[in-house]
Design a protein with these regions (language model features):
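Structural signal for interior beta-strand "rungs" in well-ordered beta-sheet cores
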Residues: 82-189
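Terminal amphipathic alpha-helical/low-complexity segments used for targeting or macromolecular assembly
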Residues: 1-80, 196-242
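P-loop NTPase switch/communication element
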Residues: 193
C-alpha cells in the first residue's frame, strides 16, 4: 500500500511539473485552444488531453535539436510525436505563435513549411511538396489563417494573411490576403468579404463537394443519353409501323 501511494505521489508531482512547464512554454498555444475550441472547459484539460499541443511540444524540442545540428534524434523525436498524436511535423518546419491544431489526426507539415502566428488547422491537413525538388518546396502560411479539415496546401506557395481555406480544398497557387479558397484545385471565391463573380456560396455548411459535383455531372450526361435513346427508339417504332 505504501509503495502504491508513493507511486501515485510521484505521478502527481510529475503531472504538476508537466503542467507548469507547458503553461510556461506554450501559453500562447494554450490560450489559442481555449479561445478557438468551444469544447475546451479548462486549462488542465487542454494541457493533458490535446494532441495538437503535445505534437507542438515534440516539434519544439526536435526543432531546437535540429538547430543545434544534433543528428538523427530530431527525426526520432518527431516520429515519437507522430506515434503518440497522429500528427507529423518535420523538425525543419518553422512555426509561429498561437498555432491551434484541432483534433489533428492525419495532419502533416513538411520540412520547409513556414507557419505564421495565430493559425488554425483541422484534421487531415497537409502542408506538402509537389515533387522531389530540393530547397524550399513547402508552403508558407502567413498570420491568422484557418485551414479546414482535409485541405491540402502543396508546393512553394504563399498563403496570405487572414485567409480561410475550405475543407478538402487543394491549393497549389499563391493566395492573396483576406481571401477564401475552396474547391479542387483551390480557387479564390471571396476576397475581403466580397463574393468573386461566379463564385460559390461560402456558407460553411454549403461548401462544395467536388465528388458530389462530379456525380451530378455524370448523372446529367446519363439523363441526356437516355433522352436521346428514347427519341431514337420512338423514331424506329414509327418507321416500323409505317
Amino acid at each position: 500500500m505504501t509503495t502504491f501511494l508513493f507511486i501515485i505521489f510521484v505521478l502527481a508531482v510529475l503531472a504538476l511539473i508537466f503542467y507548469v512547464l507547458m503553461r510556461v512554454f506554450f501559453s500562447g498555444e494554450i490560450e489559442a485552444a481555449m479561445e478557438r475550441d468551444p469544447a475546451a472547459s479548462n486549462y488542465a484539460e487542454i494541457v493533458f488531453t490535446y494532441a495538437g499541443l503535445h505534437a507542438l511540444a515534440c516539434h519544439k524540442a526536435a526543432h531546437k535539436l535540429r538547430e543545434l545540428s544534433v543528428p538523427l534524434f530530431p527525426r526520432i523525436l518527431s516520429q515519437l510525436g507522430r506515434g503518440m498524436t497522429g500528427i507529423e511535423i518535420h523538425p525543419g518546419a518553422t512555426i509561429g505563435k498561437g498555432l491551434f491544431i484541432d483534433h489533428g489526426m492525419g495532419v502533416i507539415v513538411g520540412e520547409t513549411a513556414v507557419i505564421g502566428d495565430n493559425v488554425t488547422m483541422f484534421q487531415g491537413v497537409t502542408l506538402g511538396g509537389t515533387g522531389k525538388e530540393k530547397g524550399k518546396r513547402h508552403p508558407t502560411i502567413k498570420d491568422n489563417v484557418v485551414i479546414g479539415a482535409g485541405a491540402k496546401v502543396l508546393g512553394n506557395i504563399v498563403v496570405g494573411n487572414n485567409v480561410l481555406i475550405g475543407a478538402n480544398a487543394v491549393v497549389i497557387r499563391d493566395v492573396p490576403d483576406d481571401s477564401t479558397v475552396v474547391g479542387v484545385p483551390g480557387r479564390v471565391a471571396k476576397k475581403r468579404g466580397q463574393r468573386i463573380p461566379g463564385g460559390i456560396n461560402l456558407d460553411h455548411t454549403a461548401l462544395p463537394d467536388p465528388i458530389q459535383q462530379a456525380l451530378e455531372r455524370l448523372q446529367h450526361e446519363i439523363d441526356h443519353i437516355e433522352d436521346e435513346l428514347g427519341e431514337y427508339h420512338e423514331g424506329q417504332d414509327k418507321k416500323e409501323k409505317s
